[in-house]
UniProtKB/Swiss-Prot annotation:
Catalyzes the condensation of pantoate with beta-alanine in an ATP-dependent reaction via a pantoyl-adenylate intermediate. Beta-alanine binds at residue 61. It comes from Pseudoalteromonas atlantica (strain T6c / ATCC BAA-1087). Its EC number is 6.3.2.1. It catalyses: (R)-pantoate + beta-alanine + ATP = (R)-pantothenate + AMP + diphosphate + H(+). This is Pantothenate synthetase. One of its GO terms (molecular function) is pantoate-beta-alanine ligase activity. It is an enzyme of class 6 (ligase). Homodimer. One of its GO terms (cellular component) is cytosol. Pathway: Cofactor biosynthesis; (R)-pantothenate biosynthesis; (R)-pantothenate from (R)-pantoate and beta-alanine: step 1/1. It is found in: Cytoplasm. The keyword Ligase applies. Keywords: ATP-binding, Cytoplasm, Ligase, Nucleotide-binding, Pantothenate biosynthesis.
Length: 283
């Protein structure tokens, strides 16, 4: 595996792949890799000749009171794991190379509408930061396809919309959420949880499953179903950011003809923000 931190060097390698008509898959990450990330890599390896993984903790997607400085950085271990998996290139750019004119002078990519709702309402500017860095990385790597986890469902929809709107020549694949044995969605931030919080954390997924069962049983009183879940989670010790039932296609409020919805959730245990989602068919 080659480790490349220079954009020009990456482009040189990319040209050689292009000359050989290689199919290139890309997995962008912020590092501190867990099995969820590795499953993205596995999917990429199944579909492409070349797999590129990036590790870049993107300051543009963190709010002023969020965990940019505390975010776990485990580059040496990540490098070893990716090498063992047979990744072709690990791209590790620096902030000064990605944002050469500084964060304030940076050209931004913003996907209107979908970026401002749900998680975007709780974290203003977050999806602008995500769309900007992903667009820049796509321009650098120029992959044929890219892989993202469905755990970050709204992020996945933002990226798909950006790719469509900007006529980018690549396919975006969503990969099923990877969970711990007790159901907790894997996340690099789970390590912030203390012992008591970690024991409680899977309750979020359990409550979403109960919402799913209520909908599948025929209930369509989505507001009441959501309120019931919020009450149960609050009683258990969670601080609710949002629990929403939205169209899986548009993330808008479900219409009468909706066939697929997604339950989206974000809640805090202490200072740790957990997110999860479940898709539900109404057919």
């Amino acid at each position: 595996m080659r480790v490349i931190s220079n954009i020009a060097s990456l482009r040189d390698v990319r040209r050689s792949w292009q000359a050989d008509s290689k199919v290139i898959a890309f997995v962008p990450t912020m590092g501190n890799l867990h099995q969820g990330h590795l499953n993205l890599v596995k999917e990429a390896k199944l579909k492409a000749d070349i797999v590129v993984v990036s590790i870049f903790v993107n300051p543009l997607q963190f709010g002023p009171d969020e965990d940019l400085e505390a975010y776990p950085r485990t580059l040496e271990n990540d490098r070893n794991v990716l090498s063992e998996m047979g990744v072709d290139v690990l791209f590790t750019p620096q902030v000064k190379d990605i944002y050469s004119r500084g964060l304030e002078q940076q050209t931004f990519v913003e996907v209107p509408g979908i970026s401002y709702m749900i998680c975007g309402a709780s974290r203003p500017g977050h999806f602008r930061g995500v769309a900007t860095i992903v667009c820049k990385l796509f321009n650098m790597v120029q992959p044929n396809m890219a892989f993202f986890g469905e755990k970050d469902f709204q992020q996945l929809q933002v990226i798909k919309a950006m790719v469509t709107d900007l006529s980018m020549n690549l396919t975006v694949h969503g990969v099923k959420t990877t969970r711990e044995t007790d159901g907790l969605a894997m996340s690099s931030r789970n390590q912030y949880l203390n012992v008591e919080q970690r024991a409680l954390a899977p309750t979020l997924y359990t409550r979403l499953q109960e919402m799913q069962q209520k909908i599948e049983s025929g209930r369509r009183d989505f507001s009441r179903i959501t309120s019931e879940c919020c009450e149960q989670l609050a009683e258990a010790g969670f601080s609710i950011d949002y629990i929403e039932i939205r169209s899986a296609d548009t993330l808008l409020q479900p219409g009468h003809e909706e066939t697929n919805v997604v339950i989206l959730a974000a809640a805090f245990l202490g200072r740790t923000r957990l997110i999860d989602n479940l898709q539900v068919s109404l057919a």
